[in-house]
């Protein structure tokens, strides 16, 4: 049984698939309007983060991922057990492997 949590003020719109035990925190935006977003099990999208897509760039996020406060993940792939640091920006076509750390504020 899925126990996903979507905090007050968070927005999840469009073509979004979520695994189990996913948490989307305050004022985060997950917007799959022009392509699909897939979010794996036990992934944590922290406050004010944005997950978005572009027409030819869906977004796929693995299992056990943390997307830090204010990070932007746009049209890319993020592998399992990866941390996207606070305020980091990951752009169209990027592919981040498993067990990686993207530092806070990185582009």
Give the ranges of each region predicted by the language model:
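Left-handed beta-helix
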Residues: 2, 7-8, 13-14, 19-20, ...
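Phosphate/pyrophosphate-binding betaalpha-module
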Residues: 36
């Amino acid at each position: 049984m899925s126990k996903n949590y979507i905090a007050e003020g968070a927005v999840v719109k469009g073509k979004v698939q979520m695994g189990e035990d996913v948490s989307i925190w305050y004022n985060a935006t997950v917007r799959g309007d022009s392509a699909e977003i897939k979010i794996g099990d036990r992934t944590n999208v922290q406050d004010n983060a944005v997950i978005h897509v572009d027409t030819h760039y869906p977004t796929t996020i693995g299992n056990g991922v943390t997307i830090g406060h204010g990070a932007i993940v746009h049209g890319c792939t993020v592998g399992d057990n990866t941390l996207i640091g606070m305020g980091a920006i990951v752009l169209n076509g990027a592919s981040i492997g498993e067990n990686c750390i993207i530092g806070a504020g990185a582009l």
